[in-house]
Amino acid sequence: MTFIIHFKDGHRETYSNHYDEDNEHERDAAWDDAYMTFPNADYIEEF
């Protein structure tokens, strides 16, 4: 899955991980992974 990570200072990054987005449990794991990888993110959105 691919995410856009927004930070409080205004910059953004893209982040991709290798989870199956068609599987609900793996989608949840992908979101958890993104939040754990970027704990200081202001907002994370799916791309």
Per-range role (PLM):
Residues I4, Y15-N17, A41:
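Assembly/interface hotspot detector across virion components, adhesins/toxins, and nucleic-acid enzymes
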Residues H11-H25:
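A short, exposed loop/beta-hairpin motif centered on an aromatic-Gly-Thr core
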Residues W31-F47:
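Short, mixed-charge low-complexity intrinsically disordered segments
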